[in-house]
Structures are given as structure tokens and as C-alpha cells.
From Swiss-Prot:
EC number from the UniProt entry: 2.7.1.175
Assembly and interaction partners: Monomer.
Keyword field: ATP-binding, Carbohydrate metabolism, Glycogen biosynthesis, Glycogen metabolism, Kinase, Nucleotide-binding, Transferase
Record carries keyword Cell membrane: no
GO biological process: carbohydrate phosphorylation; glycogen biosynthetic process; trehalose biosynthetic process
Biological role stated in the UniProt entry: Catalyzes the ATP-dependent phosphorylation of maltose to maltose 1-phosphate. Is involved in a branched alpha-glucan biosynthetic pathway from trehalose, together with TreS, GlgE and GlgB.
Protein name as catalogued: Maltokinase
Gene giving rise to this polypeptide: mak
Keyword hit for Ribosomal protein: no
Amino acid sequence: MSVEFEDWLTQQRWYAGRNRELVSATTAMAVRLRDGLELVLLQANYADGPDERYQVIVATGSGPIDEYSVVATIGIADGQTAYDALYDPDATRYLLSLIDESATVQNVRFVREPDVELPLDAPPRVFGAEQSNTSVVFGEDAIFKLFRRITPGVHPDIELNRVLARAGNPHVARLLGSFETEWEGEPYALGMVTEFAANSAEGWDMATTSTRDLFAEGDLYAEEVGGDFAGEAYRLGEAVASVHACLAHELGTEEVPFPADVMAQRLAAAVDAVPELREHVPQIEERYHKLADTTMTVQRVHGDLHLGQVLRTPKGWLLIDFEGEPGQPLDERRRPDTPVRDVAGILRSFEYAAHQRLVDQAGDDDDRARQLAARAREWVTRNCASFCDGYAAEAGTDPRDSADLLAAYELDKAVYEAAYEARHRPSWLPIPLGSIARLLE
């Protein structure tokens, strides 16, 4: 297939090289799945730094359906329109059928999980909520996720979903299938299919709705507002603890030293981007080095847990997207870590859910601002406590009993957030800076 990918690639939401100079995007591997449908792996070559690899399923013919013509059309190949096949219902149904058949096409292996049924006749639609992958929902039954930027190794999203599903854990969407290839002697995960959580609500949306209701009734306490989230926070804590316990049972645990030096290095790097952190460095380093001679229990965990990675269904909470921290190599994302990292991620997310509204509502009324800040702090405290209560009830151990460890991981997360906000969203920088000051009190 002869088609130029550069212009199209750089316009995609999932393209990670926007801040780099792309020299070329060449076809490194192409697998013909059927006439007019190819799985293409692209080598993105840059003026400096390492190359990146991306996956595109390319269809050729009359083009994608009209509403997606701009985002999906790649160019002209051999006199025909080449386009992203995920925007073609017939092509996506065919991809699902390959998984259903556990087919092998050249060096691409499709695998259906045991004892599952795939909704081959369900209508597909592209799901537009992701930044790094592309997903297609089939009816209300399954969601097909295509990994866009691919790296060698075992993919934790497939690996951990498979472990949890086969163990019968109720707090994940069941894995239905996956597909992978081998390139230059190394395995590459290409995509997966899980049950679709129809009629679900994202935890972030639920939490921010609760804070909106609280701020609309600023003279009421959090427990007095109709949208109080504490009960859901408790049940979420139970769900996270259940997943942690299941992963520990299935994949084991080990003891490792607390990573004081690693956290200190991240702090030093963040100070370069956020000079406001400098005044806090001695106290933060003191917190880290206080734990330097201690060991902690580590296991496989989610690794990037926050309220945007959990869904509330009619049956309970689900944890989704076990990919780990974006941008890290797969081996790093698969490294065992303390469950406290996931707990800290949720607690930091509560902080954001409340305080982002203060940023958005900033005005000239100082009394009103102080009142809302007090309500936000109260909301965060109440929901953090409820989450930890639920976690402790399920796990039998309370993360607050390891207060120094929990605070260290909250600080590490807040330092990362500060660097991110300084680069991408400066108006939100006061959120992590305020959290750091509070954690050091």
C-alpha cells in the first residue's frame, strides 16, 4: 500500500509526538487481513530522540462514513481512498470476527477468551472518550480497544484484566479477547475486547456533580447535600481493596525498600519546571528519607488509578484501563508497586474534584471564596475518610495505619501534578501546591 501517513498522523488525538519534529512516518510492517483491509505498523522517525511505533488498521475503498471523513481519511492509495478502518462498521465487525475465530493471519494472532460470546451482529460505533487509544463499542455488550502507540512487551491492561476475570473478580469488565504480533523478535500487544459497562457513570463525573451541588448550597455541610458522595466513596474503597487482594492472591507479593531516592529524583526534576516547589523541598525530602530504611509490601496494582478510571454500574464499581502510567515502558508499568500508590491516586483525585471548581469559580468575593474553600476541604476530608473506611472493611488493613507511607505517595503524586499543571494548565497549579502545603503541615 502506497500512502503518505505524516499529515494524517500528526492530526490524531492519540499521536504523542506533537512537541517533536516528525521527519517521516514509514510502513514498517503491513499485514493483509482481507482485500482492502491491512493492519499497518508505522515507524515514526524524529529529528532527535527515539523513534515511536504506531498502529493503524487501513481500509481502502469509497471512504469512511461521512460524519468521520475528516478524522478518518488518510489519503489516496493506488487510486482509492485510504482511511482508518475503525470508522467503517463492516471493517470493525470483521476484526471482531477474527477474534471470535481465534484466527492467525501471518504473524498476527487473535485470541478469544474461554467460554465467552462476542456480539458479532451488534452495531459498532467509535467511542470518543480516549486520548491514547481508539475504542469501538458493539451495541451495549462489548468494547474493542485498539492500542495506537505500541511498545514491546506484555501489555498490563490485557494481562491484569485476564487474571482478574479468570479469578471471577466482580470489579473489572470481563476480558473477551485480544490480539498481538511479533516484530523484530519482540511481542507487541495490539488490542483487546472487554465487556462494555452500559448504563455506567464515570467516577469523576459523579464526584464533580457532588461538589457542584455542595457549592450551590454553600451554607450546608457535605453530609446535608443531596448529592453527598460519601456512600459511593466507601463502596469504591471496597472495590479497590477487592482488586488488590485478588491480584496479590493470583500474582503474589514481595518486600522491597521504600524508593526514597527515586522520589527525590522526581522532586528535583519537578523543581526545574515549578520554582514554587523549591521552598518545600527540604520538608518533602525529609518525609522521603524518613522512610529510606524501611521496606514495604509490593504487588501488581492498577498503577494510574484516579476517579476517571472507575465506572459506577448498576451492580457496583468497576476499575478500568490497567495500562499503568502513560508514556512509561511496559516493563516499568508491570513492575510491582505498593497498593498505597493506588489509594493515594484516588485521594488526590478527590482533592481535584473539589478544588477544580474553586479555580473555575474564582472571583472577587473573598468571603464567598473562603466559604467555598472550607466546604471543599470538608468534602475532601469526608470522602477520603469514607474511601479508606471502605478499603479497610474489605482488606482488613487500613491504609491510614501507614500514615507516613500514604503521605509520601500523596506527596509524590502531587509533585508530579504540579509539574504537569505548570506545563499544560497553569491556572490549576494552585491545586497541587495547596495539597503539598497541607500534607506538610
